[in-house]
Amino acid sequence: MTEPRVNPNCRLEDQGITGLGNVHYNLLEPALIDAAIQRGEGKLGLGGTFLVSTGAHTGRSPKDKHVVRTPAVEDSIWWENNRPMEPEAFDRLHADMLEHMKGKDYFVQDLYGGADPALRLDVRVVTELAWHGLFIRNLLRRPEASELAGFLPEFTIINCPSFKADPARHGCRSETVIALNFDKKLILIGNTAYAGENKKSVFTLLNYILPEKGVMPMHCSANHALGNPNDSAIFFGLSGTGKTTLSADPSRTLIGDDEHGWSDNGIFNFEGGCYAKTINLSAEAEPEIYATCFKFGTVIENMVYDPDTLELDFEDNSLTDNMRCAYPLEQISNASETSLGGQPRNVIMLTCDAYGVLPPIARLTPAQAMYHFLSGFTSKTPGTEVGVTEPTPTFSTCFGAPFMPRRPEVYGKLLQEKIAKTGAACWLVNTGWTGGAFGTGKRMPIKATRALLTAALDGSLNDAQFRKDPNFGFEVPVSVPGVEDKLLDPRQTWTDGAAYDAQARKLVGMFSDNFAQYADKIDDDVRAAAIG
């Protein structure tokens, strides 16, 4: 006899969601793909992938994300970065969405957020689109069939792309809405089919919940040395900076590519899958990720393909620069079976410098690491957010401001404590431009970045000779095997040294202006490490 695939005492009607058409609980991948094809949501691709376009929204909509303002969360939410929504407006939104859902079929996935059983979040994701069920099943952690019979969700996400919000009635910015209600343990998503909103909603929940447990939630990828989970490394970075690419290293075991927690036990992945950008993806540069684009169950999102042969075009960005594939971790041959690692020995902060000023790698003191973590300097890459069409320099605190419900200092102090306790080495790595700014310079060669990271992770880089950067105060290696010396000194890569100096001074000023907001909230050693 097969196990029931849902808790019989926790169906949607038990949560007050009634009047729907057929409700499909915890379908497996073949059934979800079959349903999505029958419903005309997309096409079956080569190898059993699912090809889909998300329509108008091909990236996240951070300006349409709201947190419901209640006394319970009033003092703990970073309101300067999170748009408030009044409880009464949320209730109207909730009621109107439930009314809109009546008579329609829905797909329910009961999943875990977090590989550490003691810290995981039990999440129910209710989706209008069958392929969204496949996506979130790929991305989160899948319970065993025997666990589903007793599954009780702590939070529920309802995603209804066909629902358009009414800004006047629902207290939101536009017809697109992502509304988080921590009191009601409910997230409502409307008028966007971009699947990334589902996974980032779970990330936002964990970013709120875990700090109270002394756990540092991080927008980072992570891996560890082969056969040694205690030699782990984390890679902070905004979307498009190289988290997925650089952590998928054949010589190391992948823990995860995007979202992790750092507890007293070490590192744990929040997810059970990866959501990789596919623009200009190649079998030569990234063989593991490329191979997933032809494996059963992978969701291929917003990629152009030949209608006759179904061959994917990895260079055609006519739909978006933010084309992606979503696949379960087990599709990566060197992925960890547990998604766990020990205390990190190396903390790497990835920045995509569109000004072409920062070196390819720099060694940071713990105070400098705290400074750069709070600064979060990088560039938004095209397509990752609505309206971003070219690399746009930005300061995204904690390398993930759109997903941080609490104030930055909360996460910064947690990181400071973790680094102090473990003695992890800290590095800043520029995967952006060299030899000039975006438009004149070129992207940092990935071979050089990989060589520098290998040297940092195996410890050999600590034996190199370092120079102190005159503009930013951190230490930069003078020579590293396998990397052109000139590349390590960004001023030498520019044809006009004076132009480099001017650009560097400009960036120093930007760092200084941005960091003023944290000046009264940090320790003296971090203040002393400030740039400018």
UniProtKB/Swiss-Prot annotation:
- Its EC top class is lyase
Q: For this protein, what reaction is catalysed?
A: oxaloacetate + ATP = phosphoenolpyruvate + ADP + CO2
Q: What is its EC number?
A: 4.1.1.49
Residues reported in the UniProt entry to bind Mn(2+): 200, 219, 258
| Claim: Ligase is one of the keywords in the record | no
Where does the UniProt annotation locate this protein? Cytoplasm
Annotated GO MF terms: ATP binding; metal ion binding; phosphoenolpyruvate carboxykinase (ATP) activity
The record's section on InterPro entries has: PEP_carboxykinase_ATP, PEP_carboxykinase_C, PEP_carboxykinase_N, PEPCK_ATP_CS
Names of required cofactors:
Mn(2+)
In which pathway does this enzyme or protein participate? Carbohydrate biosynthesis; gluconeogenesis
- For ATP, which residues are the binding ones? 200, 219, 237-245, 286, 324, 449
Cellular component GO terms, alphabetically?
A: cytosol
Q: Which domain of life is it from?
A: Bacteria
Record's keyword terms, sorted: ATP-binding, Cytoplasm, Decarboxylase, Gluconeogenesis, Lyase, Manganese, Metal-binding, Nucleotide-binding
- List GO BP terms, alphabetically: gluconeogenesis
Per UniProt, substrate binds at: 60, 194, 200, 324
What positions belong to coiled-coil segments? none
Q: What does this protein do?
A: Involved in the gluconeogenesis. Catalyzes the conversion of oxaloacetate (OAA) to phosphoenolpyruvate (PEP) through direct phosphoryl transfer between the nucleoside triphosphate and OAA.
Q: Which family does it belong to?
A: Belongs to the phosphoenolpyruvate carboxykinase (ATP) family.
Provide the protein name.
Phosphoenolpyruvate carboxykinase (ATP)
Q: Which organism is it from?
A: Paracoccus denitrificans (strain Pd 1222)
Its lineage opens with: Bacteria, Pseudomonadati, Pseudomonadota, Alphaproteobacteria, Rhodobacterales
| Name of the gene | pckA
